[in-house]
Amino acid sequence: IKPACMPWGEKGGDGHGVNATNTIRAKAILRSITGNIDKIGGDQLTMPGDRGGTEDMNFNHNDLSQEQRDKMIGNERFPGLTFKGWDIISKAYPRFYPYSNAPLLFKAMITGEPYPVKACIVQADNPMLAFTNTKLVYEALKSLDLLVVHDYFMTPTAALADYALPAATWLERCSRGYPTMDVEQVSMAGSMPVVERFEGGTDVDFRDDYEFWYGLADRLGFGDKYWGPTMEDMMDGQVEPFGMKFRDFCEKVKYLKVPNKPEKYKEPGFKFLTPTGKVELYSTVIEELAKETGQDFDPLPNFVFPPDFPEVNPEYAAEYPLCM
């Protein structure tokens, strides 16, 4: 059927369980072999277009020594998420961000293995409700020497924190959004805070996410990695190619449409963000990770029985004869 779009699933339902990665990979492969990539009515490939700016002024992971990168919890067991995967994927996709596996991180907080984790900063999350095994999460957070939460509300996690810091809401910060992103256009909109915060030299007790991290980075000597001390400084960098400041963009332009052509892969020199530059039905990234770690990673999607299925644990069969 053409054109056809295969959505990711309501609330990321296909991203749970032991088959999550293979399910998502299989869907991506089906998009490819049915010819429904980047077509009107199919699955889009939205691109940066001409909006440009200094958007890629991100912290360079190469600033971390290899010794520090090797310490990332989960490097061996879940290399696709961590710096092991980043070393491979970032060559084609520089904006890939590595991170640790959360359950392993919680266990490290409690046990001190592979090394002690003594502090945690929580932002845009509530681990006490967001993760399974709440008792484990509670024990992990209580094991920390320092827990900082930056949030709108006094969540259960914030209630455990040594410092609960108020975050700026959408009314109190600069915002930039993309109301529509399809194969024909990418739309960009911007807004200034409804509550002006710095007029007359006065300040308030809340901070937006950008200010929070800039303030910490500046005190640690990394302030030059940022656009400036405020989110408006960052937004100015986003609209720099248009020859205006972000405040002017919000007042004069407000809404911008950037053309986005379908079937961009037909253009000379186009490459997909894979090591081969092609749509990979057989993942060269997973193949390389398997070689590096010695783990049995299949470059092609396969099915794995969940741990509570009779095929894996026959003891369940008598009590639960029907598995769905």
Enumerate the predicted regions with their spans.
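Long, low-complexity segments enriched in small/aliphatic residues
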Residues: 22, 54-63, 70-72, 86-89, ...
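Short clusters of hydrophobic/aromatic residues that line enzyme substrate/ligand-binding pockets
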Residues: 44, 176, 194-195, 272, ...
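Non-catalytic alpha/beta scaffold blocks inside enzyme catalytic domains
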Residues: 1-29, 33-39, 48-51, 64-241
